[in-house]
Amino acid sequence: MKITILSGGTGTPKLIQGFKEILPNEDISVIVNTGEDTYIGDIYLSPDIDTVLYTFSDLINDETWYGLKGDTFICHEQLKKFGSDEVLKIGDKDRALKMHKASSLKKGVLMSEIVDIERNSLSIKSKIYPMSNEKVESKVLIEENNEKILLKFHDFWIFRKGNAKVLDIFYENSNYAKAADGVLKAIEESDFVLIGPSNPITSIGPILSISEIKNALKEKLVFAVSPIVGENPVSGPAGTLMNAKGYPVNAIGVYEYYKDIVDVLVLDNSDINKKKDINCEVLYANTIMKTIDDKINLARNILDYYKSR
């Protein structure tokens, strides 16, 4: 069985930890959001790609869900002494990966090629694809002191910690972007596609904003795991961003966002009362993943449901 997972943020990597324990890793492909990618000084930050790389290689710091466990921060601390405004605390080994991306991009190497080099260097058997080799950037329109300001997602979430009145979210350049090499083939060859429990607006939305990818998904069996339980996002700014796009912050809002492509919506057991407003198949499970057993059980529930259809 082959599956393709759409991933961004920190929710989906937790579920990936479950799938990689019960499926041959070479049968898992992941298409990753790059809408938050940005240069910081001389390094290239691709947070969602790096998190997936570290998840598959068992290096992820699963307390912060970015960077490597056990990393040191000598470079970051030295930069701060020099007056650097580096807000995100980047570890030394993690910085090396980001330096590799920056230097490779400046040489004209495609992002899909860079990620594949890094994947192989970390002995990862699963395929990992950036959503596009072209720059698609998530932008957040906020209002501050009666003035509208357009921010990169990194500035909105890292510098401002999401504390702003959000008016809208855009995916800059998505109208012109193409799927990265290997993405469409991975979708076509998979038995089903899984949209992980990530923020629909800025973790999955940029991937779906590329028309080639969304059109390919319309031809496949698609599962989507809700990142919202009850009226609350499990983590991150999903609630604020869904409100800004006009979606209710609950399972119904998640369904409305994905309704053009989703066949099976995976909801937490506590959301059983939402079924009547959702016009697709619904799988109920424990979607709160606190332990590795939780992650494996959710992955297994999804696979078992697929096999029973």
Curated annotation (Swiss-Prot):
Listed GO MF terms: LPPG:FO 2-phospho-L-lactate transferase activity; magnesium ion binding
Cross-referenced Pfam families: CofD
Reaction catalysed by this enzyme: (2S)-lactyl-2-diphospho-5'-guanosine + 7,8-didemethyl-8-hydroxy-5-deazariboflavin = oxidized coenzyme F420-0 + GMP + H(+)
EC number(s) given by UniProt: 2.7.8.28
Enzyme class: transferase
Positions that bind 7,8-didemethyl-8-hydroxy-5-deazariboflavin: D50, K89
Keyword Nucleotide-binding listed: no
InterPro entries listed in its UniProt record: CofD, CofD-like_dom_sf, FbiA/CofD
Subunit structure comment from the entry: Homodimer.
PANTHER family: 2-PHOSPHO-L-LACTATE TRANSFERASE (PTHR43007:SF1)
Protein name: 2-phospho-L-lactate transferase
Gene name in the database record: cofD
